Amino acid sequence: MKLLTVLLFLLAYLDAKVYYAKVEPYEIRDISSNVSGLVISADETLVGQTLSQKQYIKIDSELDEKEQIAVREKLMYIKNTIEINEAVLLNLDELLAKKRENYKKIEPLKFKSSVEKDREFYDLITSENLYLNTKKEIQNLKIQMSDLKLKDAQLQRTISDKNLVAKDFVLYEMLVKSGQVVGVSTPLAKVADVSKAKLTIYLDEEDVVNAQKKVLYIDGVKSSYKISRLLNIADSKNISKYMAQIIIDSPALFSKLLKLELKDE
């Protein structure tokens, strides 16, 4: 009985596929500039550290910030002007209602001269034109406000793009220095998501079937991890191999080489 158990164990061991994989961050992002400008600060001492809400790269945004203040002041003034004009419009609406009513009353009166009637008519038309002009001015101001809101949003995005933040990511590499002028698409930094880790292996064609159901052993120890991603398209570099990835908990130390075995149990 013991001999049978040993034989079964040896068969399972021989049947297991052995791979080696480096523990890598879950994601490494290449950060490029969305704007042009002068780099004010790029703190290389942050490399290897987990970043906070504070910017790790700052591109000069002084003029953008001043312009945004001016735009927001204009928005406030236009908003106040619209409110005043809308109050004027209400008054003009009431005035027009009275003038229309008065004109309807005097128009059929025979003892009123045509000159008096014309005067009332011209006064009514003038008031109606004033009402329409005020309404038109409100519409124009609202268009200006809409344009300024768009400008404010664009400036806010530019300012954000010039103050780079990557909270909870690790600064993997700094690619610019303070005093450097950058343009759109200039590489700035690399940041890593270390909240999880990944192991990448390349399977032979015959190993792809049921690979996600296999039991994974890491450095000889059975784990609860399974293959998380499996491509059914052969890798462009590792010819006739199929990439598989295992997502694992974040380790204390990355870049270690681990031995992986895929077994039936």
PLM region spans:
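Short beta-strand-turn/beta-hairpin segments enriched in glycine/proline and small hydrophobics
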Residues: 17-41, 149-168, 190-191, 228-236
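Hydrophobic alpha-helical membrane-insertion signals
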Residues: 18-20, 168, 175-178, 184-187, ...
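Short hydrophobic beta/alpha edge segments that flank linear recognition/processing sites
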Residues: 43, 47-72, 156, 160, ...
